[in-house]
Swiss-Prot record:
Coiled-coil regions listed in the entry: none
SUPFAM superfamilies per record: Chorismate lyase-like
Protein name: Probable chorismate pyruvate-lyase
Gene Ontology molecular functions: chorismate lyase activity
Family statement: Belongs to the UbiC family.
Alphabetized InterPro entries for the sequence: Chorismate--pyruvate_lyase (IPR007440), Chorismate_lyase_/UTRA_dom_sf (IPR028978)
Organism of origin: Shewanella sp. (strain MR-4)
Single biological process term from Gene Ontology: pyruvate biosynthetic process
Subcellular localization: Cytoplasm
Keyword Cytoplasm: yes
UniProt gene name: ubiC
Primary location recorded for the protein, binned into one broad class: cytoplasm
């Protein structure tokens, strides 16, 4: 798997919309995956023998325009979630500096551990609303998929989930790559 044609950060400025008001959502089963209230990590692990997190990059960055309420630097982590060595999801997480020092969470020491395991195993992180986005076949996400040898014939979809910890908020964006969408349709994975 090579992603050398692009470099960290891979993310792009995205127009997110509220899932509750979303029109023209994709058909099932992708729609159910986008709106699933629980841990995407757990859902993905149920679809494979080997689940793996491949880190594309992480570090302090200024958020993209419109990506975070404050334009202060945040910790950005970008990974691929792979099922049986095939990338299914590109994930981009934004963590405010104030949360990096939280005792309950060792964000900087996650390594290849899935972030979802940490967030859904602690009551101090409360899952919030889900927003949805679609990506054209010319988007940076599509370019990333193509660099992973995944053909992009149709628009791609992703979701952004808010997580609250005390007065702080972090965002986890999960974009479904073509291999995931094809497998969901083929296996009828809801």
């Amino acid at each position: 798997m090579s992603v050398t044609s692009l470099s960290f950060p891979y993310g792009e400025s995205i127009q997110w919309f509220c899932a509750d008001n979303a029109k023209n959502l994709p058909s099932s089963p992708l729609k159910e995956w986008l709106l699933a209230p629980g841990s995407l990590t757990q859902k993905l692990k149920g679809c494979c023998d080997k689940f793996e997190v491949k880190i594309l990059g992480e570090g302090q960055c200024v958020p993209l325009e419109g990506e975070y309420p404050k334009q202060n630097a945040v910790w950005v982590r970008e990974v691929l979630l792979c099922l049986d060595s095939v990338p299914w999801v590109f994930a981009r997480t934004l963590i405010p500096q104030s949360l990096l020092s939280t005792r309950q969470a060792d964000f900087l020491g996650l390594g290849t551990r899935p972030l979802g395991e940490l967030l859904f195993s602690q009551d101090s992180f409360v899952p919030g609303r889900i927003e949805i986005a679609r990506f054209t076949t010319e988007s940076r996400l599509a370019q990333l998929a193509q660099s992973l040898a995944q053909n992009v014939e149709h628009e791609l979809w992703g979701r952004r989930r808010y997580f609250h910890h005390d007065q702080e908020e972090m965002f986890v964006s999960e974009m479904f790559l073509p291999a995931a969408v094809q497998a969901m349709a083929k296996l009828k994975l809801d």
